[in-house]
Amino acid sequence: MQKRKLGKSNLEVSALGLGCMGLSFGYGPAVEKQQGISLIRAAVEGGVTFFDTAEVYGPFTNEELVGEALAPFRSKVAIATKFGFKIDPNTGKQAGLDSRPAHIKEVAEASLKRLRTDVIDLFYQHRVDPDVPIEDVAGAVKDLITQGKVKHFGLSEAGANTIRRAHAVQPVAALQSEYSLWFREPEAEIIPTLEELGIGFVPFSPLGKGFLTGKIDENTAFDSSDFRNIVPRFTPENRKANQAVVDLLGKFAQEQKITPAQIALAWLLARKPWIVPIPGTTKLHRLEENLGATNVELSPQDLRQLETATSQIAVHGARYPEALQKLVGR
């Protein structure tokens, strides 16, 4: 698979990464451990060298899964994980944000153990903590980099001003935020900021939490533990209204003799050479389909047509419930 550099950092990874969250958390019950290990290892065989996890996924179990699966290939892959939530040790529930420097260092030590490694390739602040100056956060990660425990610093769902302030203390290698044909807000301010500063962009939910694959409609029932049950964009009414986006992708995919998911990923890959999407899946055939997107080349005309057609479709429903929306873009 082709490689990409995340901005001006020397972190070079496969053009597509693997978002591992859904193997343990967020989209219904966790997969059986051996199934998760097999899927992650199949990604390695398919050329993926960039794997994304976080302590809060599970919590903790996703890091353990990723660590075990990647142990035989550790020198050939980059592992990204995240800090920034307060997790109740008794219940395992999120209990707000915590990016105090002492806590960041505790999380790093615990994540290193769960990931079975002596260094974290990319350590993201999962959400901006309004109670801790971003300069202190960047300084704490800088210390971890100096100590050889972390290689690169990242931010997630941060606003442009926060990115600038953090980058002035410790160069930010990558920003991870949602970006897809279904959510294009980063184009206004975030992407120009990243381009100016030389920071890579790692879009999560590049397939719109599965919606852009064309396999979800208004009648799809989600498991009771599936995060999409509380997402306004995923109410049955909004799924019905948003079907126009999927139909459009289906039409383009048919013309190109590929799948809607491959169109959505190829579109992202064509946006900038320093964009590395991290689609997730629990299914081997979907992994293979996603990886196939790296061989799709959309012509300038294809991209223009897609641009024109999608710009005429209004997307219905917020991407987060109100409480979670308050945590992004700060």
Language model features by range: what are they?
Residues 1-78:
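N-terminal binding-site loop/beta-alpha segment at the start of enzyme catalytic domains
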Residues 3, 128, 132-308, 313, ...:
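Beta/alpha (TIM)-barrel catalytic core signal, keyed to glycine-rich beta->alpha loops juxtaposed to Asp/Glu
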Residues 30-43, 99-114, 159-164:
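Short, acidic/polar
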Residues 67-78, 113-116, 145, 167-170:
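Acidic (Asp/Glu)-rich catalytic clusters
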Residues 112-130:
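Active-site groove signature of glycoside hydrolases
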Residues 31-35, 61, 65, 95-103, ...:
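Alpha-helix N-cap and loop-to-helix initiation/capping positions
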Residues 9-27, 80-95, 119, 124:
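N-terminal small/glycine-rich loop or linker at the start of catalytic domains
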Residues 18-20, 53, 122-125, 155, ...:
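Conserved beta-strand positions
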